[in-house]
Amino acid sequence: ASCGCTTPRYDTRPLAPGDTALITVAYDSQGRPGRFAKSVFINANTTPPRSVLIIKGVVVGAPQTIARRFPVDFGPLKMAHSSVILGQVMRRHVKSVFTNGYNGSTDTISPTVAYAPKWLEVTPTPRDVPPGERLSLSFYVNGDRVPLYGANLDSVVIVPDSRHPEIRHTLEISVDVHEDFSKVEPRALARAPQAAVDSELINITCDGDGHAVLRLSNRGKGEPLLIRRVYTLSPALEVSVPKSGKVKKGRTADIYISMVREALPSDGRPLDARVFVITNDPVTPVITVRVTAACP
């Protein structure tokens, strides 16, 4: 059989001319809702030596099984996840990620995509999904089309059934974009910039002005250090970088980090955030700086 979920049973005794035999094939449907098609291969001393049987059908999942495997409720469309993490993709590279859904209604639905960022192609398959069957959403990302280095957060708006375009649901999307340095030659590496910061831990005092300075240096021997991006995912911090966006060899540049007091944790917990510095340093393209603050 083509998978462990399909079990054939048969008599191994030789079959005389004109005689018949029974082959029983069972499909284990537990935890596998939706359409299935499995192959069973019969090998014998015949011509041709191999025959193929197909077992197919649709498994209508029990409510508890559907709720466990597709817990996200998009109306008639049940999704396996409420967000899609595309992971890391390099510039000049592409990547595909898939997630599954299930038609939990009693009618055929035709899911469509009402919105996706320009750098992402989202395709539902199949176009029409009968009741009790699954669909696949493919996410195709081109690293050159994503606008920012590092983390990019966006969303995709799904219409579960094109006959009701007013019903829409949102899937959160994230992708982490970096430069591909895998083909940098030794001669270029010797002249490459080298990024360094004066500290990878910054504590902002609450009784001051709420600012800190991170000093970025280029310790390389040739090329300028290009600042691809400096950012934080914390709403309690703001960062600003030099307008030139580059640091010559042997020079430094200041990155200003400001605390947004009104965005600090309301329960009094200390701030523990990260600032990411992305450059064209092929050895250390990303430097992570921890920023803390404890304000009563």
Question: What are these model-predicted stretches?
Answer:
Residues 23-31, 137-145, 255-263:
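Short, hydrophobic beta-strand segments
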